[in-house]
Swiss-Prot record:
The lineage of its organism: Eukaryota, Metazoa, Chordata, Craniata, Vertebrata. The putative Groucho interaction domain between the N-terminal CTNNB1 binding domain and the HMG-box is necessary for repression of the transactivation mediated by TCF7L1 and CTNNB1. Detected in the basal layer of epidermis and in outer root sheath and bulge of hair follicles. Residues 64-78, 427-437, 470-491 have a biased composition (Low complexity). Residues 1-71 are annotated as: CTNNB1-binding. Changing L383P: Abolishes DNA-binding and transactivator/repressor activity. One of its GO terms (cellular component) is nucleus. Belongs to the TCF/LEF family. Binds the armadillo repeat of CTNNB1 and forms a stable complex. Interacts with DAZAP2. CDD domains: HMG-box_TCF7-like. It holds the Pfam family CTNNB1_binding. Residues 1-28 have a biased composition (Gly residues). This is Transcription factor 7-like 1. Residues 492-501 have a biased composition (Polar residues).
Length: 584
């Protein structure tokens, strides 16, 4: 940061109110109309020196002049936060004023000021500068910038996010500072230009039409200088970018950087590229869209918007293979049908019918063809030999004439066709019947299942609780099981006892005693499976008054622990018909 000297180093400019500073040596850093960028390198607080009064006064004047020069910048109480974004505006102010002067004599060249009022000029840093890599701004404002028009991204101004305290390019050194708004711009939107023109993508604005001159309105061929190339790049490809003049003036052998909208993956959907504009670039200016650099990631499949909209060429029909080129039976049959049907020559009777038919129809009131043919047949047989000989002679001449006209004709042709049609019809009918029978057989085989007679097992202990379907096999009630959580539920073998075992509680208790070790291992599994699968027989627990005395009192041979665990299962497994009877 330039240090301020002891005395006044600079004076405010005329109308602009710009300040000029001086170093300790007293050398001027620039003219009176230039601004001095003050930048804090590491964020340390400035230590007050001995000559605080004069230095603080000079600093206050410079700060006030800078605030007056900046647009839409609110003053802050924190001087550190107010000075930090200031060099970015100063650094962009210089090249903007410089290019404003350069653009006046070059109104007909690359940069036109009034043609695109909705899209401001974009500051592109000179990538050949040695100060592009990580680090602060180049000292002394030696960094050069290149302006570009950016009509390829259209986002309404209401959808953009503006930040009045956007960081300087020094803090964005790890990113590509491709587009920087001159005054305020959110760091997350480096590729959006701010426009107040609200138009739908379906109807592009008039300043994007390449066929009409925006000044004269006369259709003209587009000029390559009026369409700015677009420049979406990843941060890792900064070192591989050539001089920016290569984008504006494409030369042979110099790569250009153009990625399709599908390859430009940005986390914010507002930055999506207009597909119509990208297709406009690729279709009308193919020399400006060259293959991408090998270091850049490219998508394997081209986006449909990038493909040049030339006239669609239908793919040529593939050459027919010999199998396809051979005449199929259908085509042969059609050709045979197209051939004219050659009738056989008329015999003597047919010639007589042809001659006498009109007379018979006029004499008779019958209109049926069969009746007329019968009448003609009777008349033919009534004729004498001489009269019939005349028609036989006519028939012979008819055959000779037919043989001259159709020398290769044979009567088998017509009859063969009829027989062939009949055979094809019969074959088609038999094939259809076979297909119907096969389909019906397949459906019948799928629907039918082998019937296996279900026989209950002989051993009652191996049969499931639901095999007999009687009331004796129903599980215990859940209410009785909940009454004593310490007592295990009735197990598989206890619930499946036949009538002879369930009528004797003593024998039932002895069976439970002998199988206690085996039942304890299966108690939990059978309890969970049977309680959820079968409905209980009793809806409420039985009162103790209806229980027999022999069931309520356990035999003296049982230990106390066995009585606690086995008494309730014995009571739970008794059906209602057996519990109400008294024990013998």
């Amino acid at each position: 940061m330039p240090q301020l000297g002891g005395g006044r180093g600079g004076a405010g400019g005329g109308g602009g109110g710009s300040g000029a500073g001086a170093t300790s040596g007293g050398d001027d850093l620039g003219a009176n109309d230039e601004l001095i960028p003050f930048q804090d390198e590491g964020g340390e607080e400035q230590e007050p020196s001995s000559d605080t009064a004069s230095a603080q006064r000079d600093l206050d004047e410079v700060k006030s002049s800078l605030v007056n020069e900046s647009e839409n910048q609110s003053s802050s109480s924190d001087s550190e936060a107010e000075r930090r974004p200031q060099p970015a505006r100063d650094a962009f102010q210089k090249p903007r004023d410089y290019f404003a002067e350069v653009r006046r004599p070059q109104d007909g060249a690359f940069f036109k000021g009034g043609a695109y009022p909705g899209y401001p000029f974009l500051m592109i840093p000179d990538l050949s500068s040695p100060y592009l890599s990580n680090g602060p701004l180049s000292p002394g404002g030696a960094r050069t910038y290149l302006q570009m028009k950016w009509p390829l991204l259209d986002v309404p101004s209401s959808a953009t996010v503006k930040d009045t305290r956007s960081p300087s390019p020094a803090h964005l050194s790890n990113k590509v500072p491709v587009v920087q708004h001159p005054h305020h711009m959110h760091p997350l939107t480096p590729l959006i230009t701010y426009s107040n023109d609200h138009f739908s993508p379906a109807s592009p604005p008039t300043h994007l039409s390449p066929e009409i001159d925006p000044k004269t309105g006369i259709p003209r061929p587009p000029h390559p200088s009026e369409l700015s190339p677009y420049y979406p790049l990843s941060p890792g490809a900064v070192g591989q970018i050539p001089h920016p003049l290569g984008w504006l003036v494409p030369q042979q052998g110099q790569p250009m950087y153009s990625l399709p909208p599908g390859g430009f993956r940005h986390p914010y959907p507002a930055l999506a590229m207009n597909a119509s504009m990208s297709s406009l670039v690729s279709s009308r200016f193919p020399h400006m869209v060259a293959p991408a650099h090998p270091g850049l990631p490219t998508s394997g499949i081209p986006h449909p918007a990038i493909v040049s909209p030339i006239v669609k060429q239908e793919p040529a029909a593939p050459s027919l293979s010999p199998a396809v080129s051979a005449k199929s039976p259908v085509t042969v049959k059609k050709e045979e049908e197209k051939k004219p049907h050659v009738k056989k020559p008329l015999n003597a009777f047919m010639l007589y019918m042809k001659e006498m038919r009109a007379k018979v129809v006029a004499e008779c009131t019958l209109k049926e063809s069969a009746a007329i043919n019968q009448i003609l047949g009777r008349k033919w047989h009534n004729l004498s030999r001489e009269e019939q000989a005349k028609y036989y002679e006519l028939a012979r001449k008819e055959r000779q004439l037919h043989a001259q006209l159709y020398p290769t004709w044979s009567a088998r042709d017509n009859y063969g066709k009829k027989k062939k049609r009949k055979r094809e019809k019969q074959l088609s009918q038999t094939q259809s019947q076979q297909q119907i029978q096969e389909a019906e057989g397949a459906l019948a085989s799928k629907s039918k299942k082998p019937c296996i007679q279900y026989l209950p097992p002989e051993k009652p202990c191996d049969s499931p609780a639901s095999s007999h379907g009687s009331a004796l096999d129903s599980p215990a009630t859940p209410s009785a099981a909940l009454a004593s959580p310490a007592a295990p539920a009735a197990t598989h073998s206890e619930q499946a006892q036949p009538l002879s075992l369930t009528t004797k509680p003593e024998a039932r208790a002895q069976l439970a005693l002998h199988s206690a070790a085996f039942l304890s291992a299966k108690a939990a599994a059978s309890n969970s499976s049977q309680m959820g699968s079968q409905p209980p027989l009793l809806s409420r627990p039985l009162p103790l008054g209806s229980m027999p005395a022999a069931l309520l009192t356990s035999p003296p041979t049982f230990p106390a622990t066995l009585h606690a665990h086995q008494a309730l299962p014995v009571l739970q497994a008794q059906p209602l018909s057996l519990v109400t009877k008294s024990a013998h």
